[in-house]
Design a protein with these regions (language model features):
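A short acidic, leucine-rich amphipathic alpha-helix
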Residues: 41-46
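Conserved adenosyl
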Residues: 107-246
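A short glycine-rich, Lys/Arg-flanked "PGG" loop and its adjoining helix->strand segment in the class I
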Residues: 247-259
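C-terminal alpha-helical "lid/dimerization" subdomain adjacent to the S-adenosyl-L-methionine
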Residues: 266-321, 328
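Core SAM-dependent methyltransferase catalytic element
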Residues: 322-344
Length: 344
Protein backbone atom coordinates (compact mmCIF):
# COMPACT_ATOMS: atom_id res chain seq x y z
CA UNK A 1 0.00 0.00 0.00
CA UNK A 2 1.05 3.61 -0.55
CA UNK A 3 2.02 5.76 2.40
CA UNK A 4 -0.93 5.51 4.80
CA UNK A 5 -0.98 9.24 5.49
CA UNK A 6 -1.35 9.91 1.75
CA UNK A 7 -4.02 7.24 1.60
CA UNK A 8 -6.02 8.99 4.35
CA UNK A 9 -5.75 12.35 2.59
CA UNK A 10 -7.02 10.67 -0.57
CA UNK A 11 -9.96 9.19 1.34
CA UNK A 12 -10.85 12.62 2.74
CA UNK A 13 -10.69 14.29 -0.66
CA UNK A 14 -12.72 11.58 -2.37
CA UNK A 15 -15.36 11.69 0.35
CA UNK A 16 -15.70 15.42 -0.30
CA UNK A 17 -15.88 14.86 -4.06
CA UNK A 18 -18.62 12.27 -3.54
CA UNK A 19 -20.76 14.86 -1.74
CA UNK A 20 -20.20 17.40 -4.49
CA UNK A 21 -21.07 14.85 -7.16
CA UNK A 22 -24.36 14.27 -5.36
CA UNK A 23 -24.98 18.03 -5.27
CA UNK A 24 -24.16 18.24 -8.97
CA UNK A 25 -26.73 15.55 -9.68
CA UNK A 26 -29.51 16.98 -7.52
CA UNK A 27 -29.05 20.52 -8.88
CA UNK A 28 -28.79 19.14 -12.44
CA UNK A 29 -25.50 20.97 -12.95
CA UNK A 30 -24.02 17.93 -14.67
CA UNK A 31 -27.04 17.76 -16.97
CA UNK A 32 -26.43 21.39 -17.91
CA UNK A 33 -22.84 20.45 -18.81
CA UNK A 34 -23.78 17.33 -20.77
CA UNK A 35 -23.20 18.92 -24.17
CA UNK A 36 -19.55 19.58 -23.14
CA UNK A 37 -19.83 23.31 -23.97
CA UNK A 38 -17.34 25.58 -22.18
CA UNK A 39 -19.09 28.06 -19.88
CA UNK A 40 -18.24 30.63 -17.26
CA UNK A 41 -19.70 30.17 -13.79
CA UNK A 42 -22.20 32.92 -14.61
CA UNK A 43 -23.32 31.16 -17.79
CA UNK A 44 -23.62 27.79 -16.05
CA UNK A 45 -25.59 29.31 -13.19
CA UNK A 46 -27.96 31.05 -15.60
CA UNK A 47 -28.43 27.89 -17.68
CA UNK A 48 -29.17 25.89 -14.51
CA UNK A 49 -31.25 28.64 -12.85
CA UNK A 50 -29.00 28.51 -9.79
CA UNK A 51 -27.13 30.96 -7.55
CA UNK A 52 -23.81 31.87 -9.20
CA UNK A 53 -21.80 32.12 -5.99
CA UNK A 54 -22.71 28.56 -4.99
CA UNK A 55 -22.09 27.29 -8.50
CA UNK A 56 -18.64 28.89 -8.54
CA UNK A 57 -17.62 27.30 -5.25
CA UNK A 58 -18.97 23.93 -6.39
CA UNK A 59 -16.89 24.28 -9.54
CA UNK A 60 -13.83 24.85 -7.37
CA UNK A 61 -14.40 21.49 -5.72
CA UNK A 62 -15.00 19.52 -8.92
CA UNK A 63 -12.10 21.18 -10.75
CA UNK A 64 -9.60 20.41 -7.97
CA UNK A 65 -11.22 16.99 -7.77
CA UNK A 66 -10.31 16.38 -11.43
CA UNK A 67 -13.92 16.05 -12.52
CA UNK A 68 -14.42 19.29 -14.46
CA UNK A 69 -11.86 20.96 -16.74
CA UNK A 70 -10.97 24.65 -16.23
CA UNK A 71 -9.44 27.16 -18.66
CA UNK A 72 -7.92 30.03 -16.63
CA UNK A 73 -7.38 32.23 -19.70
CA UNK A 74 -11.11 32.86 -20.11
CA UNK A 75 -12.34 31.38 -16.83
CA UNK A 76 -14.52 28.75 -18.47
CA UNK A 77 -15.46 25.27 -17.30
CA UNK A 78 -16.28 22.15 -19.30
CA UNK A 79 -17.00 18.47 -18.87
CA UNK A 80 -15.40 15.94 -21.19
CA UNK A 81 -17.67 13.69 -23.24
CA UNK A 82 -16.46 10.60 -21.37
CA UNK A 83 -17.23 12.11 -17.97
CA UNK A 84 -20.52 13.62 -19.10
CA UNK A 85 -21.82 10.16 -20.03
CA UNK A 86 -21.02 8.87 -16.52
CA UNK A 87 -22.26 11.85 -14.50
CA UNK A 88 -25.55 12.92 -16.07
CA UNK A 89 -29.03 11.65 -16.72
CA UNK A 90 -28.23 11.32 -20.41
CA UNK A 91 -25.62 8.62 -19.93
CA UNK A 92 -25.79 4.86 -19.56
CA UNK A 93 -24.95 4.89 -15.84
CA UNK A 94 -25.02 8.01 -13.68
CA UNK A 95 -22.36 7.74 -10.97
CA UNK A 96 -23.31 11.18 -9.65
CA UNK A 97 -26.75 9.81 -8.82
CA UNK A 98 -25.20 6.93 -6.88
CA UNK A 99 -23.25 9.40 -4.74
CA UNK A 100 -26.55 10.36 -3.11
CA UNK A 101 -26.07 7.27 -0.94
CA UNK A 102 -23.30 9.01 0.98
CA UNK A 103 -25.43 11.85 2.33
CA UNK A 104 -28.46 9.58 2.76
CA UNK A 105 -26.47 7.23 4.98
CA UNK A 106 -24.63 10.00 6.83
CA UNK A 107 -28.02 11.40 7.86
CA UNK A 108 -28.36 8.67 10.52
CA UNK A 109 -24.76 8.68 11.77
CA UNK A 110 -25.69 10.00 15.22
CA UNK A 111 -28.28 7.26 15.70
CA UNK A 112 -25.86 4.61 14.45
CA UNK A 113 -23.23 5.72 16.97
CA UNK A 114 -25.79 5.28 19.75
CA UNK A 115 -26.49 1.76 18.46
CA UNK A 116 -22.77 0.94 18.66
CA UNK A 117 -22.90 1.92 22.32
CA UNK A 118 -26.27 0.48 23.35
CA UNK A 119 -27.28 -2.00 20.65
CA UNK A 120 -30.60 -1.97 18.84
CA UNK A 121 -31.13 -0.44 15.43
CA UNK A 122 -32.23 2.57 13.42
CA UNK A 123 -35.82 2.32 12.09
CA UNK A 124 -36.80 2.95 8.47
CA UNK A 125 -38.57 6.19 9.33
CA UNK A 126 -35.31 7.78 10.49
CA UNK A 127 -33.91 7.82 6.97
CA UNK A 128 -34.19 10.92 4.82
CA UNK A 129 -34.84 10.49 1.07
CA UNK A 130 -34.02 6.78 1.26
CA UNK A 131 -36.86 5.55 -0.98
CA UNK A 132 -36.07 8.32 -3.46
CA UNK A 133 -32.39 7.36 -3.66
CA UNK A 134 -33.21 3.65 -3.81
CA UNK A 135 -35.65 4.28 -6.65
CA UNK A 136 -32.97 6.22 -8.54
CA UNK A 137 -30.52 3.35 -8.12
CA UNK A 138 -33.06 0.74 -9.17
CA UNK A 139 -33.85 2.82 -12.24
CA UNK A 140 -30.20 2.42 -13.26
CA UNK A 141 -29.52 -1.21 -12.41
CA UNK A 142 -32.76 -3.23 -12.38
CA UNK A 143 -35.29 -1.44 -14.56
CA UNK A 144 -33.31 -1.00 -17.82
CA UNK A 145 -32.44 -4.71 -17.85
CA UNK A 146 -35.59 -6.17 -16.30
CA UNK A 147 -37.62 -7.15 -19.36
CA UNK A 148 -34.83 -8.02 -21.81
CA UNK A 149 -32.14 -9.45 -19.51
CA UNK A 150 -33.32 -10.34 -16.00
CA UNK A 151 -36.67 -12.03 -16.65
CA UNK A 152 -35.24 -14.15 -19.52
CA UNK A 153 -32.82 -15.70 -17.01
CA UNK A 154 -35.77 -17.94 -16.09
CA UNK A 155 -36.58 -20.38 -18.92
CA UNK A 156 -40.00 -19.76 -20.55
CA UNK A 157 -40.88 -17.03 -18.04
CA UNK A 158 -41.41 -14.27 -20.59
CA UNK A 159 -43.77 -16.50 -22.58
CA UNK A 160 -45.75 -17.30 -19.42
CA UNK A 161 -45.96 -13.62 -18.51
CA UNK A 162 -47.31 -12.82 -21.96
CA UNK A 163 -50.03 -15.47 -21.59
CA UNK A 164 -50.95 -14.40 -18.08
CA UNK A 165 -49.76 -15.44 -14.61
CA UNK A 166 -49.95 -14.12 -11.03
CA UNK A 167 -46.86 -12.28 -9.80
CA UNK A 168 -45.88 -11.00 -6.36
CA UNK A 169 -43.01 -8.59 -5.65
CA UNK A 170 -41.85 -8.80 -2.02
CA UNK A 171 -40.48 -5.56 -0.63
CA UNK A 172 -41.65 -3.74 -3.74
CA UNK A 173 -40.58 -0.31 -2.49
CA UNK A 174 -41.70 2.45 -4.84
CA UNK A 175 -42.99 -0.13 -7.31
CA UNK A 176 -40.64 0.57 -10.21
CA UNK A 177 -40.03 -3.07 -11.12
CA UNK A 178 -43.63 -4.20 -10.65
CA UNK A 179 -45.08 -1.30 -12.62
CA UNK A 180 -42.65 -1.93 -15.47
CA UNK A 181 -43.59 -5.62 -15.62
CA UNK A 182 -47.28 -4.76 -15.46
CA UNK A 183 -46.91 -2.33 -18.35
CA UNK A 184 -45.10 -4.90 -20.51
CA UNK A 185 -47.29 -7.90 -19.65
CA UNK A 186 -50.92 -6.71 -19.48
CA UNK A 187 -52.34 -10.26 -19.36
CA UNK A 188 -50.63 -10.98 -16.03
CA UNK A 189 -51.70 -9.79 -12.58
CA UNK A 190 -49.14 -8.10 -10.32
CA UNK A 191 -49.20 -7.60 -6.54
CA UNK A 192 -46.67 -5.61 -4.52
CA UNK A 193 -46.06 -5.94 -0.77
CA UNK A 194 -44.11 -3.43 1.32
CA UNK A 195 -44.54 -2.27 4.89
CA UNK A 196 -43.73 1.35 4.05
CA UNK A 197 -46.94 3.34 3.66
CA UNK A 198 -45.03 6.06 1.82
CA UNK A 199 -43.61 3.58 -0.70
CA UNK A 200 -46.99 1.95 -1.35
CA UNK A 201 -48.66 5.32 -1.89
CA UNK A 202 -45.94 6.33 -4.36
CA UNK A 203 -46.16 3.00 -6.21
CA UNK A 204 -49.94 3.29 -6.51
CA UNK A 205 -49.74 6.82 -7.90
CA UNK A 206 -47.11 5.77 -10.44
CA UNK A 207 -49.26 2.81 -11.49
CA UNK A 208 -52.19 5.14 -12.13
CA UNK A 209 -49.98 7.49 -14.15
CA UNK A 210 -48.87 4.57 -16.32
CA UNK A 211 -52.46 3.46 -16.81
CA UNK A 212 -51.80 0.00 -15.36
CA UNK A 213 -55.02 -1.89 -14.64
CA UNK A 214 -53.34 -5.09 -13.49
CA UNK A 215 -51.52 -3.98 -10.32
CA UNK A 216 -52.33 -4.04 -6.62
CA UNK A 217 -50.03 -2.49 -4.02
CA UNK A 218 -50.59 -3.41 -0.39
CA UNK A 219 -49.01 -2.30 2.87
CA UNK A 220 -48.07 -5.73 4.16
CA UNK A 221 -45.57 -7.15 6.65
CA UNK A 222 -44.09 -9.99 4.62
CA UNK A 223 -43.52 -12.02 7.78
CA UNK A 224 -47.28 -12.61 7.62
CA UNK A 225 -48.60 -13.50 4.16
CA UNK A 226 -52.34 -13.76 3.50
CA UNK A 227 -53.03 -17.50 3.74
CA UNK A 228 -55.07 -17.73 0.56
CA UNK A 229 -52.54 -16.13 -1.80
CA UNK A 230 -50.74 -18.28 -4.37
CA UNK A 231 -48.47 -17.03 -7.14
CA UNK A 232 -46.76 -18.34 -10.24
CA UNK A 233 -43.80 -16.01 -9.75
CA UNK A 234 -42.46 -14.21 -6.70
CA UNK A 235 -39.71 -11.63 -7.07
CA UNK A 236 -37.56 -9.85 -4.49
CA UNK A 237 -35.19 -7.14 -5.66
CA UNK A 238 -32.57 -6.28 -3.04
CA UNK A 239 -35.12 -6.88 -0.28
CA UNK A 240 -34.58 -10.16 1.60
CA UNK A 241 -31.44 -9.21 3.53
CA UNK A 242 -33.25 -6.20 5.09
CA UNK A 243 -35.95 -8.34 6.68
CA UNK A 244 -36.20 -8.75 10.44
CA UNK A 245 -36.90 -12.47 10.01
CA UNK A 246 -35.49 -13.40 6.59
CA UNK A 247 -35.84 -17.16 7.15
CA UNK A 248 -39.54 -16.77 7.93
CA UNK A 249 -40.04 -14.53 4.90
CA UNK A 250 -38.41 -17.13 2.66
CA UNK A 251 -40.64 -19.81 4.21
CA UNK A 252 -43.68 -17.66 3.44
CA UNK A 253 -42.53 -17.10 -0.13
CA UNK A 254 -42.07 -20.84 -0.65
CA UNK A 255 -45.55 -21.52 0.68
CA UNK A 256 -47.07 -18.83 -1.54
CA UNK A 257 -45.55 -20.18 -4.74
CA UNK A 258 -47.46 -22.74 -6.79
CA UNK A 259 -45.89 -26.15 -7.33
CA UNK A 260 -44.58 -25.15 -10.76
CA UNK A 261 -43.77 -21.59 -9.67
CA UNK A 262 -40.48 -19.71 -9.46
CA UNK A 263 -38.81 -17.40 -6.95
CA UNK A 264 -36.52 -14.84 -8.61
CA UNK A 265 -34.33 -13.05 -6.08
CA UNK A 266 -31.83 -10.30 -6.82
CA UNK A 267 -29.35 -9.60 -4.03
CA UNK A 268 -25.84 -8.33 -3.44
CA UNK A 269 -23.16 -10.35 -5.23
CA UNK A 270 -20.75 -11.23 -2.46
CA UNK A 271 -19.35 -14.11 -0.45
CA UNK A 272 -20.47 -15.00 3.06
CA UNK A 273 -16.79 -15.03 4.08
CA UNK A 274 -15.04 -11.69 4.70
CA UNK A 275 -11.71 -12.95 3.37
CA UNK A 276 -13.31 -13.58 -0.02
CA UNK A 277 -14.61 -10.01 -0.19
CA UNK A 278 -11.30 -8.22 0.40
CA UNK A 279 -10.84 -7.72 -3.35
CA UNK A 280 -14.50 -6.89 -4.05
CA UNK A 281 -14.49 -3.65 -6.09
CA UNK A 282 -17.28 -2.21 -3.94
CA UNK A 283 -16.48 -3.98 -0.67
CA UNK A 284 -16.09 -0.89 1.57
CA UNK A 285 -19.23 0.72 0.17
CA UNK A 286 -21.37 -2.40 0.50
CA UNK A 287 -20.29 -3.14 4.07
CA UNK A 288 -20.96 0.53 4.89
CA UNK A 289 -24.46 0.55 3.43
CA UNK A 290 -25.11 -2.69 5.30
CA UNK A 291 -23.95 -1.28 8.64
CA UNK A 292 -25.70 2.06 8.21
CA UNK A 293 -28.93 0.70 6.74
CA UNK A 294 -29.57 -2.95 5.86
CA UNK A 295 -28.38 -4.54 9.10
CA UNK A 296 -29.61 -1.82 11.44
CA UNK A 297 -33.19 -1.59 10.10
CA UNK A 298 -33.52 -5.30 10.78
CA UNK A 299 -32.11 -4.94 14.30
CA UNK A 300 -34.52 -2.05 14.94
CA UNK A 301 -37.31 -4.62 14.62
CA UNK A 302 -35.53 -7.03 16.99
CA UNK A 303 -34.57 -8.90 13.87
CA UNK A 304 -31.76 -11.14 12.72
CA UNK A 305 -29.59 -8.33 11.33
CA UNK A 306 -28.54 -10.39 8.33
CA UNK A 307 -27.05 -7.46 6.43
CA UNK A 308 -26.39 -6.81 2.75
CA UNK A 309 -23.21 -8.89 2.73
CA UNK A 310 -24.85 -12.17 3.77
CA UNK A 311 -23.33 -13.66 0.65
CA UNK A 312 -24.06 -16.39 -1.86
CA UNK A 313 -23.22 -19.31 0.43
CA UNK A 314 -25.62 -18.16 3.17
CA UNK A 315 -28.31 -17.24 0.65
CA UNK A 316 -28.28 -20.70 -0.93
CA UNK A 317 -28.30 -22.33 2.51
CA UNK A 318 -31.35 -20.32 3.60
CA UNK A 319 -33.18 -20.94 0.33
CA UNK A 320 -32.59 -24.68 0.73
CA UNK A 321 -33.83 -24.57 4.33
CA UNK A 322 -36.99 -22.78 3.16
CA UNK A 323 -37.75 -25.70 0.85
CA UNK A 324 -36.24 -24.58 -2.44
CA UNK A 325 -34.43 -27.71 -3.62
CA UNK A 326 -33.12 -26.19 -6.85
CA UNK A 327 -31.21 -22.90 -6.74
CA UNK A 328 -29.42 -21.52 -9.78
CA UNK A 329 -27.24 -18.40 -9.37
CA UNK A 330 -26.73 -16.08 -12.33
CA UNK A 331 -24.88 -12.85 -13.06
CA UNK A 332 -25.38 -10.30 -15.83
CA UNK A 333 -22.55 -8.48 -17.63
CA UNK A 334 -24.10 -5.05 -17.04
CA UNK A 335 -24.52 -5.62 -13.29
CA UNK A 336 -21.37 -6.67 -11.37
CA UNK A 337 -22.97 -5.76 -8.03
CA UNK A 338 -25.75 -8.38 -7.89
CA UNK A 339 -26.47 -12.09 -8.07
CA UNK A 340 -29.76 -13.37 -9.48
CA UNK A 341 -31.11 -16.47 -7.72
CA UNK A 342 -33.62 -18.68 -9.53
CA UNK A 343 -35.21 -20.96 -6.95
CA UNK A 344 -37.88 -23.65 -7.15
Amino acid sequence: MENFEDYMLDVMNKAAIALMLSVGHRTKLFDSMYDCTSMTSEQLAAKSNLNERYVREWLGAVVTGKIVDYNPSNKTYSLSEEKAKLLSRGGSYNFASSMQWISALAYVEDEIVKCFEKGGGVPYESYHRFHEVMADESAQTVLPALVNDILPLVPNLVERLKKGIRVLDVGCGSGGALNLMAKNFPNSQFTGYDFSKQAIEYATIESEKLGNKNTSFQKQDVEHFPENETFDLVTAFDAIHDQAAPAKVLDNIRRAIKDDGIFLMQDIGSSSQLENNKTHPLGPFLYTISCLHCMTVSLALDGHGLGAMWGKEKAIEMLNEAGFSEVDVKQLPHDPINYYYIAK
